[in-house]
Curated annotation (Swiss-Prot):
Belongs to the universal ribosomal protein uS17 family. GO terms for cellular component: cytosolic small ribosomal subunit. It holds the Pfam family Ribosomal_S17. Gene3D superfamilies: Nucleic acid-binding proteins. One of its GO terms (molecular function) is rRNA binding. NCBIfam families: PRK05610.1, uS17_bact. This is Small ribosomal subunit protein uS17. The gene is rpsQ. One of its GO terms (biological process) is translation. It comes from the Bacteria.
Amino acid sequence: MAEAEKTVRTLTGRVVSDKMDKTITVLIERRVKHPIYGKYVKRSTKLHAHDESNQCKIGDKVSIRETRPLAKTKSWALVEVLERAVEV
């Protein structure tokens, strides 16, 4: 019996917290059209992602993928850091 290949969900967002060990909080922003007025509104979602080597810092632009549940609220994993935050 052949199993269907499952597509891997990937998202891109900004790191807003790196205070936890091996975990980052990523803010995902998307634009949604308002059903009545037609204006595009920003909507956002915060996701916890696994960062095995603690390489991410606040402000980094990262790519994450869905994975099996790793904790109560963590079911995403870091794929790569797309852009480093500018240090002041």
